[in-house]
A protein has these predicted regions:
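N-terminal secretory signal peptides that target proteins for export/translocation
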Residues: 1-2
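Eukaryotic scaffold repeat domains enriched in small/polar residues
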Residues: 7-10, 14-231
């Protein structure tokens, strides 16, 4: 009888831990301090950064940030001062995108079905509901709790959803500063590459390498010519 009660206690603890784990992102978002912004100022912000929804997928060579919930995967990209967020379903099928102008860093997260877009320089968060009908802008108080939330959930390159671990990887580009893959590891430790932009990054690295090599050759040639002239 005693063993039966112990087993029930273990089962109860297991389910409680699962509930806490699955709601971690949502509850942590509630801990940060935000203030609503008026309709006029919201409109001005959305207009000034040219925030808009797009229906064509734009492919990039590296992933800047990502977010996961039960039904969606969001991938964030930098294209100079233009930022893009591609939204995919849980089978990695493209659905739609958002794009906007921003000169600083940005990050993304989900609060349940709501997409949260953080503009770090401006200290604001833009939230878009699942139906894509409501866009809300709030100012965020910059404090220790906010920084901890950013580090743990928004900036993190490793995230957990429904006992599955997701992380950004450089793939086989060991010395690359860019993340080219989003990898999923399930509860049985089976690994699956969901998105892979490594081939696109090879082209970029080749172009950059060629430019650097050309610059070094020109520099060495100038040094050699200068030494020869002095002789």
């Amino acid at each position: 009888m005693k063993n039966k009660y112990i087993l029930l206690i273990y089962i109860f603890i297991y389910f409680v831990c699962n509930i806490i784990n699955s709601s971690a992102n949502a509850s942590s978002y509630k801990l940060i301090s935000t203030s609503p912004i008026g309709i006029e100022e919201t409109t001005n912000i959305i207009t000034s950064i040219d925030f808009r929804k797009e229906n064509s997928e734009k492919i990039f060579s590296s992933i800047s940030c990502f977010a996961i919930n039960d039904e969606s995967i969001a991938l964030g990209y930098n294209d100079g001062d233009r930022k893009y967020i591609n939204i995919y379903d849980d089978y990695c099928n493209y659905e739609y995108s958002y794009s906007f102008d921003n000169y600083g860093s940005f990050g993304i997260d989900f609060q349940n079905d709501t997409l949260l877009v953080y503009l770090l320089r401006e200290n604001i968060v833009i939230s878009i509901n699942k139906d894509k009908t409501t866009i809300e802008v709030k100012s965020v108080e910059e404090n220790d709790e906010y920084q901890e939330y950013l580090d743990k959930f928004v900036y993190s390159k490793v995230k957990v959803c429904n006992d599955n671990k997701y992380y950004l990887s450089t793939g086989d580009l060991l010395f690359s500063p860019s993340y080219t893959q989003l990898v999923k590891v399930d509860e049985n430790n089976n690994k699956e590459i969901l998105f892979d932009f490594t081939k696109d990054n090879y082209i970029n690295l080749f172009v950059i390498g060629t430019i650097v090599l050309l610059f070094v050759c020109i520099l060495l040639l100038l040094i050699y010519s200068n030494i020869k002239r002095k002789k």
